[in-house]
Structures are given as C-alpha cells and as structure tokens.
Amino acid sequence: MARLVAVCRDGEEEFPFERRQIPLYIDDTLTMVMEFPDNVLNLDGHQNNGAQLKQFIQRHSMLKQQDLSIAMVVTSREVLSALSQLVPCVGCRRSVERLFSQLVESGNPALEPLTVGPKGVLSLTRSCMTDAKKLYTLFYVHGSKLNDMIDAIPKSKKNKRCQLHSLDTHKPKPLGGCWMDVWELMSQECRDEVVLIDSSCLLETLETYLRKHRFCTDCKNKVLRAYNILIGELDCSKEKGYCAALYEGLRCCPHERHIHVCCETDFIAHLLGRAEPEFAGGRRERHAKTIDIAQEEVLTCLGIHLYERLHRIWQKLRAEEQTWQMLFYLGVDALRKSFEMTVEKVQGISRLEQLCEEFSEEERVRELKQEKKRQKRKNRRKNKCVCDSPASLHTADEKAVSQEKETDFMENSCKACGSTEDGNTCVEVIVTNENTSCTCPSSGNLLGSPKIKKGMSPHCNGSDCGYSSSMEGSETGSREGSDVACTEGICNHDEHGEDPCVHHCEDKEDDGDSCVECWANSEENNTKGKNKKKKKKSKMLKCDEHIQKLGSCITDPGNRETSGNTMHTVFHRDKTKDAHPESCCSTEKGGQPLPWFEHRKNVPQFTEPTEMSFGPDSGKGAKSLVELLDESECTSDEEIFISQDEIQSFMANNQSFYSNREQYRQHLKEKFNKYCRLNDHKRPVCSGWLTTAGAN
C-alpha cells in the first residue's frame, strides 16, 4: 500500500516530487505526498515462464529501434477510451482523468516506468523499453492485474459506484482499525501535521456537539470556558475546580491559534476512545455543572475532530491509491496492445486474419463436401429416373384420332383374347410356349409353380390359375385348372383322358380366340373366390392393372413356329432372383400379326413421353410404354426352354410356396395398384385404355 512520506507546506507546485510520488489533497490547509514503494512494481524479481519469455524475446528482437519507439507510444484518447469501457464507477473515471491531467501539466514521474508527456502522450522509459525481460514482466505479469483489480472493487448495485466514491463513505463510522492503519502509513512529519489542530475548526466541532446533545445555558457556558482555557484565552488558576491533568499532552499556540496534540500512539488512542461512544450513535441530554466535567467534554470534542481528520486521510489515501493503479494498469494494457499490433504488422499477417483464414478454409472444405454429396445425389437420381424429352404439342384432330385408335386397340385386344365378359371385366392374355391355350391370371405375373403331386400329368390346360382372391379362410387353388401348371406342363389333364393339346388354338388363325374353355373355367373359378374387399375396389384401379398387363405382352412378327400354332412367351417372376419383368411375349398366328400389333405401331404417333417407374423398390431407370413395346421386339429366335428336371428341382426347393402364396399375391397386388395410382395422371394413353376397359 502507498505511504504518506511528506507534507506540501509551500504548495505542491514547488515540491520536488520523486519517482512514483503524487500529491494527496486532504483539505484546504493540508496536502501530503503519497509514494508507491518499489516492491509494488518489481520488474526483476519475478520468475517468468521460460517458453513464453523466449517467444516474447524473439518477437521483441523482430522490431527495429525506431519501430519499437513508435510502438511504445499511446495517446490519451486510447487510454481514456479503455477507461470508459472497463471502469463502471463514475467517481473512479473522474479521478483517473483528473490524475492524468495533473501529470500532463506537472510532468512528474508518478507512473514510472511509464512517462506522461506534455501533449498527453503515454510512453515508456528507455531502460525498460530496450530490456525484453523487464518489458515482458511489465506487460504480462503486472499488466494482467487490470481486470482482477477492477473486478475486486466493491460496487453499489444501485448506481455502480465503488465504496470509496459513494456518499455513505464520507460519514464517520464507529472506531475500528482504519485509523490505526493510516496512522502506521504516515511518516513522523505527517503525524505531527495531523495532530496540529486549528482552534477555529475545534470550536466548530464543539458547537455542533453542544447543539446535538442539548446542553443547557449554564452547562454550555461551562464548556466554552473550558475551551478558552485550552486555547490560552483564560487563566486556568482563576477557575474554581480546574484539573490540569486533563489537559496533559496538549499544548496551545495563542498567536497562531493552534493546538498541538502529543503524537504518541497511546495518547491518540486515548483521545479517540473518548469519542467512541459518540460514533456509536444515540442522542442524550448532557450536563456540565463543574469545570472539570466541562474539560472532559472538550477532550471528547477534540477526539471527534481528530478521528474525523484521520478518517478523511484514510479515505483520500485509498481512493488515490486506487486511481493511480487504474491509470497505471490502463497505460500498460494500452502499450501492450500497441506493441502486439506493431509486431503483427511486421509479421505481415495478424492473428485475427489468421483466424479468419482458418474459418474460411473450414468453410471451403465444408462446401466441397456438401457439393460432393449433392453431386452424388444428383447422379443417383439420374441413374434411377431417366427423363424423356418433352414431346411436341398435338392438335385437336390428332388427339381425336389417338382416342379412336385407343378404342380400336381395346376392342382388338379383347377379341384376340377371346373374352366374352362384359366391359367391366379386365383380363390379360398370357400365352405359353408349349402350344397350349392362353390363360388370364388376375395378378399379372406368374409365381413359381407348386410341387407336383403323384398321379398328375405334366400337361394340363386348366384355367383357374390357382388364384384365390379371398383374404381369409379360402384355400389356395390346386394344380387342377392352374395356368401355372399348364404353362409348366405339370397339370393332370392326361389322367382324365384328355389330350394335352386338345385346347390348342388352331380353330381359326384369323380370330383372336384362344382356349375358350380355359377362359370360361378361369372366369368361373375367379368369380367364386372373390371376397367383399375385392368387390369394393374401384373400376379405375382395375383398369390400371389391365393396362399394366397389356403393356407386358405384345406380338413379335419375327418369331414364328413351323407348326402354325400360336407361340406364347410368359413373364416369369422368380421370387428368389429378380422382382422385375425381364422378357415380353410375342404372338403371331399363321404369319399374320394380331390386331394389337398394328395398334402398337401407331402408339408412338400419339403417346406423350412421360416418366414412369416400375415400382417403389425398382432400381432400374423409368421407361415409357413405347420403349417397353420396342424392347419386346428384341426377343431372340431361340426361346428359353426349361426342362422337366429343372421344374421338379425348382418345386422341390420351394415347398413353402403354398403357405406363403397369399402373401405373394397380396404383395404383387399392392405394388401394381401403387404403380397404377402413380402413373394414372401421367399417361393419357393409359387413361384412355382405362376408360374403355374394366377390372376383375
């Protein structure tokens, strides 16, 4: 803590202030000299961090002498700007500004090693500027105490003032150790000056005391007479009841009107002890009937006056010490920032720019990653969904012709199938390569064939397709009348004496009739197996199923059989391999294409290319109906032949088919219905077909 080392008797302008000494104004009659010891700013005795000190020395050596001199100069604006930002107490800010102005005017080395120039410029001494170790200790050891010192100052919650600048501090408080603390920090010269009491000031304190305690007129006169004896205006020998021992240690100067009090600590403590009940509080009526009691009242007022003076000195000392520390640490912090900015300019890039560059680099890396992800998703969407080029607009006449062709196509397709059902019934022509009749399964794709029973013929022309639409309690169809069994050649029609080829389509090549008996059986069996849920399905949804089935089976004029019988190729869906159709059938009778083949040639003239997906789980690209029809022509001349051994091996490996058959059928129905719903609004051709066809 700072000490009081001297008294400015002739005025502070003429006093020779040394390093770290500032004047301390007490009142109009007293100004002391306040000094900060050297151990407060010991720049040589600290143990510094070796790595940080080495780095600082390296940075210090980077600067030339001229650059270092420029870096170690800051203006008053920078210091006061930091003051307004860091210090909340308005009293502290005003005190710092006042002290800085005093140092600018006087030029005293009060902040050494900091110096204050006449133009308000704050700098460092040459010895500290050139010594890297001292500079490091000043910047990073003492300079780091600024925030801690500001945070440690108690502040009022009401107005953010510190205790030293609040109004409550000016009121005297009960005696404590504060007077002893300030008494110990005073030099002998300061103590002698403190105990030198002005008689007029003591009289003012005495009158206040008499009014406070309501002394009567006689008692008040007794006290005033005792005061006059103390200052030497009355002869004490003439006063009856006067006690000279009470005024022991007190000496008056009548010419200068001073009262000299003994500066011994014990005597001062005795006087302050008399005044302690007064500071404890409470007003009471007091009397002084005799002169000795009046003397004691005068000593009490002397103790009050002395305590108030010591309390004022203690308050001024602490406030000025806090002000000096704030100004010193603010100057050190401003110089440190100036030094670091100069070093960064020499290096060519600041730490802030480095940080911004790091953030920019991270942002660029993040953008590259996101761009790669977007490109991957874009490529994945391109591979999954191949978009067709937009078709040109058609006139109203072309649309009318297209609708007529669609109607003709539906009529021809029904004739080719030989169906005798009404317009609400939708069937699909599925033709086999076994020279047998065609069948009309309701699901659109044939599942694997069941296991062959004993006594059954490998060839059959039944037409119930093994399909049961009932969702609960219905038995699955047998091989008797199953189109799968007929297709694979494992039905038992031969056991009943029927010719395996009795239903071949050789009646009329010009007709579209094929296997009328199979159609009739299929219609009868399918009608019996329908449940209520199947009947409630909308006609439009069933027509969508029919359109999907019609698009999967087309005629191919390039494939012909020498026997003249109709050749059929069926879509096969293997539940263990692929869930997508891979081939399409082509049908031709006696060298003359079926009616829907002629219609297929006309389809590209009026169909609009749209996006199409085979199903939600399809991994292939979407293809239009025209592309599917074109691909159907690319069947090879050599048809895939499945031997009887392969069929039996397949049946043996899939014994659990019957138990899961209803699940497979339901799964296929849901997928097909979903496809129809997704593509109903996209294809005008399909919509045209659906309006002319029904569904089972």
Curated annotation (Swiss-Prot):
Keyword Phosphoprotein: yes
InterPro entries xrefs: GGNBP2
Localisation per UniProt entry: Cytoplasmic vesicle
Superkingdom of origin: Eukaryota
Main localization category: cytoplasm
A single BP term in Gene Ontology: negative regulation of receptor signaling pathway via STAT
Annotated GO CC locations: cytoplasm; cytoplasmic vesicle; nucleus
UniProt keyword Phosphoprotein, yes or no: yes
Alphabetical keyword list: Cytoplasmic vesicle, Developmental protein, Differentiation, Phosphoprotein, Spermatogenesis
Phosphoserine modified-residue sites: S360
Function: May be involved in spermatogenesis.
Subunit structure: Interacts with GGN.
Entry protein name: Gametogenetin-binding protein 2
UniProt organism field: Rattus norvegicus
